[in-house]
Amino acid sequence: MKYTIDELDKMEGHKFEYAVADLLRHNGYREVQVTQASNDYGIDILARRKNVKYAIQCKRYTGHVGNKAVQEAGLGMDFYHCDAAAVITNSSYTKQAVKLAETTGVRLWDRSFLISLSQNYKDDEYERPVRRPVERNLKIADVPEND
């Protein structure tokens, strides 16, 4: 199912996780699975793209995502023996979260990335996406001063 950003914004946490898993699956990620709700070590989705295994934390927020999500994603990556960690949100990140992600290597997938996943959604999950979702490396300079 293709999702609009407005639909994603209104979803409850667990439903949002399943929607993100579906979006990833239909954008070329493989072996996509939603982890158990409890004892997930901060990781909501495990997925593979090319030869990289991702540990992904989902945050459906109305505010900015902070340090805690970045810390949990990094720890969860180690627990699940993944190659990379990411936090995906329908929102944005605090400066502190961006700074921590820069030093730990956790990838921050923001609202723009989520929208690109939705726009590139292919009905047949085995088709290649129209365009590869653009993953930006967020830097402190990308975060407005009032955050």
Indicate residue ranges for each PLM-predicted region.
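Mixed-charge (Asp/Glu-Lys/Arg
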Residues: M1-D147
